[in-house]
A protein has these predicted regions:
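Flavin-dependent oxidoreductase catalytic cores
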Residues: 1-284, 288, 292-299, 398
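Glycine-centered short loops/turns at secondary-structure junctions
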Residues: 43, 171, 193, 301-303, ...
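Short, ordered loop/turn segments at secondary-structure junctions
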Residues: 51-54, 66, 138, 203, ...
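Anion (oxyanion) recognition and catalysis
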Residues: 127, 168, 298, 341, ...
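General small-molecule cofactor/ligand-binding pocket signal
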Residues: 175, 346-350, 386, 456-458, ...
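Rossmann-like dinucleotide/flavin-binding elements
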Residues: 275-309, 313, 348-365, 369-379, ...
Length: 540
């Protein structure tokens, strides 16, 4: 079928779009109405019509997208004519008592595009046909930069203020969606009269019990969405050509969650048989993986000893106590600590597990959650540099001008933190792409934030030598020396060697599991998922 739209154009995929005529509009309005009646006959209470994100309604309402010169373009009344035709057809088809909700952009964040004032005026026109309004923002082709799917670098509740403007134009209930992950923000926005209700999307994957926990006063037990895009990283349709899977594989990937290991499991956790017996399990390592494994095993009736060699739980996630871009990840780390503390888990801090004492805890099995450490490759002059992670806990006091050797996720995120706190950072990366182990929307959000902050980025650049005053590098422009007050390196991570511990445990007949970075260095989602799967195995 040919593509049609408000105007003649060529879309991102190179497909020519024909401008719609009135016959097209009548057919599409009728299709909307028929679809709504199908939902009504199927027993649903209502439908939500998505009019935002650069879809059909936005294409007509936006003065930037709709440049028609007939009665469907120009003034707001003209641009609203076809969207109102659709809503009117739907309402007439389903009758007065069926819910018809409308999701609409408060702004598309495009110069010359939609404004909250115009959206408010449109909502006033649509009042006879709809029952409530969802305020969102942005366009599909620029999901990250326009806030359609907000990142951790966007403010929470980024559409609430625009919803408050739109609310002035209508008596209908107005809600906001986007970046809302706390009951406190919901309550505040409603109490201030900015919205009538809050809408949660990704947050309900992070914690489906959000509303129930808030109702019971257990806000501190809510797993709050990180906006990390694990659940949906983007798609080829949106122009992401760096996704490490096909469209078919993407369909299987969607719905996973970094902080909720139960999301998208290949089985229903509610159907798990109870543990056949109670066992004692020793968990070595108190990072994210170790804590999640302890929580899961304890909840299944097992006796848990959680041994952490340091004075605090948290592992590598303790860097979030400092990094101002990671408040939600810090909240998750703190939640895991609280969840461990409120359970009957025997926590042993400042406890080093050795091959000699691993059998002295009376455990039936051992879960190794020993994590990873920064790699220190043989770069000439590496002794003049410091590990990037060391600056988070005060081991390093960086100077003003910093060169970060290694532009993977750790190097980029640590460099971004330093840039935002007043330092001048240059990131040097051998590969042609920074943050190469990331992809899709998160990588776009990270690189965009780095660009906005003025970080210098040198991909396809080899580090030849680190000196007391800088870094000697080589790229297509030749050899040069980058001056630096401090040189940091983030050149990968390596798993802590657990071979002697594992051998000692297995020699004594103990069951063993390896989870998280102890398997191989990875991300938080790999830690929580492997931890949950190990935790449910204890006692089986």
């Amino acid at each position: 079928q040919e593509a049609i739209g408000p105007i003649e154009t060529t879309n991102l995929a190179g497909v020519k779009v024909r401008p719609m005529n009135e016959d097209d509009m009548a057919r599409i309005a009728r299709d909307f109405a028929v679809s709504a009646t199908y939902m009504q006959k199927a027993g649903f209470d209502g439908v939500l019509i998505h009019g935002g994100h650069g879809f059909l309604f936005t294409q007509f309402l936006s003065p930037l997208m709709n440049t028609r010169t007939d009665s469907y373009g120009g003034s707001l009344e003209n641009r609203a004519r076809f969207p109102l035709q659709i809503l009117k057809a739907v309402r007439e088809a389903v009758g007065p008592d069926f819910l018809v909700e409308l999701r609409i952009d408060g702004t598309d964040h495009q110069p010359g595009g939609i404004t909250p004032e115009e959206t408010g005026a449109f909502v006033a026109m649509a009042e006879p046909y709809i029952t409530s309004v969802h305020v969102t923002c942005g366009i599909y082709e620029a999901s990250v930069k326009s806030g359609t799917e907000s990142s951790m670098f966007h403010p929470h509740g980024l559409n609430i203020d625009n919803a408050a403007i739109i609310k002035k134009y209508t008596k209908l209930p107005v809600g906001a969606v986007g970046g809302i992950n706390s009951p406190e923000l919901c309550e505040q926005a409603i109490a201030e009269g900015k919205i009538d209700f809050a809408i949660l999307g990704r947050q309900m994957l992070a914690d489906p019990e959000f509303a129930n926990k808030a109702k019971r006063g257990h806000e501190d037990q809510i797993r709050r969405c990180l906006r990390c895009y694990k659940c949906f990283p983007g798609s080829p349709e949106e122009g992401y050509d760096d996704l490490p899977f096909t469209s078919e594989e993407l369909a299987l990937y969607v719905g996973h969650c970094t902080i909720n290991p139960l999301a998208h499991l290949p089985f229903d956790p509610d159907t798990l048989a109870p543990a056949s017996k109670q066992e004692t399990v020793l968990i070595v390592g108190g990072g994210a993986a170790g804590m999640q494994a302890a929580i899961t095993a304890c909840d299944r009736g097992q006796k848990v000893i959680l041994a952490e060699q340091g004075p605090r739980l948290g592992g590598l996630l303790r860097f979030t106590d400092v990094d101002t871009d990671k408040p939600d990840l810090m909240n998750f780390k703190n939640l895991l600590v609280r969840e461990v503390e409120r359970r009957d888990i025997d926590v042993r801090l400042n406890t080093v597990i050795t091959p000699e004492n691993i059998t002295s805890f009376g455990a039936d099995g051992v879960i190794f959650a020993t994590g990873s450490l920064p790699s220190c490759p043989p770069v000439p002059g590496i002794g003049h540099a410091h590990k990037a992670m060391d600056m988070y806990d005060g081991k390093v006091k960086p100077g003003h001008k910093i060169v970060m050797v290694g532009g993977g996720l750790v190097g980029c995120e640590a460099g971004l933190f330093l840039q935002k706190t007043g330092h001048e950072v240059t990131v040097v990366e051998l590969l042609g792409r920074l943050a190469n182990e990331s992809f899709g929307m998160y990588r776009e959000a990270l690189i965009w934030e780095m660009e906005k902050c003025g970080m210098a980025m040198l991909p396809k650049t080899r580090c030849l030598e680190i000196t007391p005053t800088g870094v000697k590098v080589e790229n297509a422009g030749g050899v040069q020396t980058l001056e630096a007050d401090t040189v940091l390196f983030a050149l990968g991570m390596k798993s802590v060697d657990i071979a002697p511990l594992k051998a000692a445990a297995e020699a004594a007949g103990l069951k063993t599991w390896v989870i998280g970075d102890a398997i191989q260095p990875g991300k938080v989602d790999q830690a929580t998922r492997s931890a949950y799967l190990a935790g449910i195995e204890v006692g089986r």
